[in-house]
Curated annotation (Swiss-Prot):
Residues 1-37 are annotated as: Disordered. GO terms for molecular function: RNA binding. This is RNA silencing suppressor p19. Residues 1-15 have a biased composition (Basic and acidic residues). Belongs to the tombusvirus protein p19 family. Homodimer. InterPro entries: Tombusvirus_p19 (IPR004905), VP19_sf (IPR036131). One of its GO terms (biological process) is symbiont-mediated suppression of host innate immune response. Viral suppressor of RNA silencing which binds specifically to silencing RNAs (siRNAs). Acts as a molecular caliper to specifically select siRNAs based on the length of the duplex region of the RNA. One of its GO terms (cellular component) is virion component.
Length: 172
């Protein structure tokens, strides 16, 4: 009975934090606070006639442990600096620690999900494979958010990767 009460308290804390956008709580796997756009900001960047369109200001990601789900919306400006910031939104250690609050002797399902530019990736597995699951989630997140050469910050010509001019000179 005591274990069930503790579990319910943890779920209530997770539910409150999920919607209040808090960070740094003892249960959340996320290190950054929720950065969801305001209603006004959302309307400025979206066409109301297209209901399934993502907000171009960032991306959504979530971690689920059994019935408890932690969600975040993070701003992402598609620059190298922004990429490094959002890649640090959680670590394997923070995920393991958060999951340990909900794991018992039985194996439960663990899920990571990310949605960016209309592409959604979900990775799931049992709690006994959590380390492997978080490694796969990190790789998936990096690949999905990977910058194209046009989006890389550069001193040369902002958007043009170094070496382009050299290649053009050689081909002439």
């Amino acid at each position: 009975m005591e274990r069930a009460i503790q579990g319910n308290d943890a779920r209530e804390q997770a539910y409150g934090e999920r919607w209040n956008g808090g960070s740094g709580s003892s249960t959340s796997p996320f290190k950054l606070p929720d950065e969801s756009p305001s209603w006004t900001e959302w309307r400025l960047h979206n066409d109301e006639t297209i209901s399934n369109q993502d907000n171009p200001l960032g991306f959504k990601e979530s971690w689920g442990f059994g019935k408890v789900v932690f969600k975040r919306y993070l701003r992402y400006e598609r620059t190298e600096t922004s990429l490094h910031r959002v890649l640090g939104s959680w670590t394997g250690d923070s995920v393991n620690y958060a999951a340990s609050r909900f794991l018992g002797f039985d194996q439960i399902g663990c899920t990571y999900s990310i949605r960016f530019r209309g592409v959604s990736v979900t990775i799931s597995g049992g709690s006994r494979t959590l380390q492997h699951l978080s490694e796969m989630a990190i790789r998936s997140k990096q690949e999905l958010l990977q910058l194209t050469p046009v989006e890389v910050e550069s001193d040369v010509s902002r958007g043009c990767p170094e070496g382009i001019e050299t290649f053009k000179e050689e081909s002439e």
